[in-house]
Curated annotation (Swiss-Prot):
Gene it is expressed from: ATG15
Source superkingdom: Eukaryota
Species for this entry: Yarrowia lipolytica (strain CLIB 122 / E 150) (Yeast)
Protein name per UniProt: Putative lipase ATG15
UniProt similarity note: Belongs to the AB hydrolase superfamily. Lipase family.
Active-site residue numbers: 331
GO cellular component terms, semicolon-separated: membrane; multivesicular body membrane; vacuolar lumen
Length: 549
């Protein structure tokens, strides 16, 4: 049963009264949960309550457009069952070690850029801002937003019927037409990849009163940059992207990064073919059919990166309640930045991010209807020689597939700012061009002007897949079982009597019900059917004796 899951639809005329009553009861229960959470009665996943804070977004009378940022904290949220939050307050010792690592990793062009401007990527990053009108929720405290996300997940049919309180506000956004600003945000995104030392600089900020206070590195990491300009209200969160062993030396987060990549950017749990190991059990067994309810549950699970990013944002708003927050990141970090920006209506700048429109819709993230593109607060920077950003890193022979990454999305939300390096420089599609240092040194710094940010072209991901809800799948299974029983009974009552008194033994094939395929190969051929049919009819023809009287 194929349906558009992202559009409000009316129930079919054949809906029974009991099913209608169930929908009404479910709606009332979901609304009650949503209201209770929004009133502040939520206990964050069994942990000690962290105050839900809405950053003070009142602009100063004459805000300065020039800012200078320095890293002050590094947050980490692991994705194990016993989730711990780690925060390192940056010390002078750490800055000196990070500077050395940064100079070893960044290209010479970046060295010259920083030296010529008397700036260091860890102590002084220049940014320019501008005031822009943005339409977003009036009530954006984490408790309220997360209660909505939970309600939308429990009853997605109500998503289109919810009435949101939208408000237009003037906020500070990054000036994406300024070259220094775009480069500085990219350097922040690259800093999130730098390995952090296991020293006494770390401070445990676990929300739990008791329990382990360890450091686990296989999760989400975010660097927090604070504006050093007096009176400035800005903080930037830089989220780490994918660490992939096939692209670099890898790291502690490789396994979790890969799992979240395959969950966020594949059509159905990385079910590319029967040869692939899926990251969740949402594939129904029918060709190109996936359980949408299962997917939404997996995306919002506690051990997934989107949930971890929400918790990092909650921590930062608690630490800086009077600051406005921007977010940036590269690759996976860029996609998570855009999703976080969409969730809370904050400015987000991503670099070479995979298409994140599909998970944005699956999570029912709030998006104001009918806003002009001039009010868009999410920007995606990329170039035409990056197969991940362009959405073409798929197929059996692609680098992503060889490495076990199911990168099947290409659609972005927000504005696209694309450098045409294929035409201008003669580049070819290559995974090497996806690296953040290649982007900084050979693209952002090689152009005198930033790329124009324009609305993305019409786009649709996973057009050949059929996404069904759990209830729809159950109804389809019931209909198939009814068909089986009907055809079986009709084939049994097939004996007829005539006036002839002889007995004839004939080999006849009973009319089998339509077989249900439970497993297909990579090109769609069924290789295993429903075991009920085999048990009922066997593998050979049935010999039926018909008596003619």
């Amino acid at each position: 049963m194929k349906q558009d899951l992202y559009k409000e639809s009316s129930p079919p005329p054949s809906t029974t009264k009991s099913k209608g009553l169930y929908v009404i009861v479910a709606a009332l229960v979901t609304t009650a949960i949503y209201l209770l959470y929004s009133q502040g009665y939520s206990n964050t996943h069994g942990e000690k309550d962290m105050p839900s804070v809405v950053p003070n977004l009142v602009l100063p009378a004459n805000p300065s457009s020039d800012h200078s940022f320095a890293v002050k904290h590094i947050y980490h949220h692991n994705t194990e069952a016993d989730a711990n939050h780690g925060r390192m307050d940056v010390s002078g010792e750490w800055v000196r070690a990070a500077q050395k690592a940064q100079h070893l990793n960044l290209g010479q062009d970046t060295h010259r850029y920083m030296a010529s401007n008397a700036r260091d990527p860890y102590t002084n990053l220049p940014l320019k801002s501008r005031t822009q009108k943005v339409k977003r929720w009036r009530q954006r405290d984490p408790d309220h937003v997360e209660s909505y996300l939970e309600a939308a997940r429990l009853n997605p049919q109500l998503y289109g019927a919810m009435d949101f309180d939208w408000v237009e506000e003037d906020i500070l956004v990054p000036d994406v037409t300024d070259r220094d600003t775009v480069v500085s945000l990219a350097v922040m995104a690259s800093n999130a990849y730098v390995d952090v030392p296991f020293t006494g600089d770390w401070t445990n900020v676990s929300w739990k009163e008791t329990g382990g206070i360890g450091w686990q590195s296989d999760g989400v990491r975010g660097h927090i940059f604070v504006d050093q300009t007096p009176g400035s209200p800005l903080v930037v969160i830089a989220l780490k992207g994918t660490s992939a062993a096939i692209f670099d030396s890898g790291g502690d987060t490789v396994i979790n990064d890969k799992t979240n990549d395959n969950l966020l950017f594949s059509c159905c749990c990385a079910r590319v073919s029967y040869l692939w190991n899926t990251v969740c059990d949402c594939y129904t067994g029918e060709s190109y059919t996936c359980d949408q309810e299962c997917l939404e549950k997996e995306l919002y699970a506690e051990d997934r990166y989107y949930r971890a990013v929400l918790d990092i944002y909650r921590n930062v708003t608690h630490l800086y309640p009077q600051k406005q927050i921007w977010v940036t990141g590269h690759s996976l970090g860029g996609a998570l930045s855009a999703m976080l920006g969409r969730t809370y209506g904050i400015p987000a700048v991503g670099y070479e991010a995979p298409g994140e429109l599909l998970p944005t819709k699956r999570l029912h993230l709030p998006s104001p209807p009918g806003i002009p593109w001039s009010q868009e607060h999410i920007w995606h920077f990329g170039h035409t020689a990056d197969p991940i950003f362009m959405g073409v890193c798929n197929g059996a022979s692609s680098s992503c597939s060889i490495g076990g990454y199911a990168m099947e999305t290409s659609c972005h939300s927000g504005l696209q700012c694309m450098y045409d390096v294929v035409t201008d420089k003669g580049w070819h599609l290559s995974m090497v061009n996806h690296r953040i240092h290649t982007v900084i040194d050979e693209v952002l710094l090689a152009y005198n002007e930033t790329a124009a940010c324009v609305p993305p072209p019409p786009c649709q991901d996973c057009f050949n897949w059929n996404f069904v809800m759990g209830n729809d799948k159950d109804d389809d299974d019931k209909d198939k079982k009814k068909k089986k029983k009907t055809s079986t009974s009709s084939s049994v009552v097939s004996k007829t009597k005539t006036s002839t008194s002889s007995t004839v033994a004939t080999n006849t094939m009973p009319s089998l019900p339509d077989p249900t395929c439970v497993e297909r190969n990579w090109y769609g051929k069924c290789i295993r059917y429903d075991p009920e049919i085999k048990q009922q009819y066997g593998d050979s023809h049935t010999v039926t004796h018909v008596t003619m009287a």
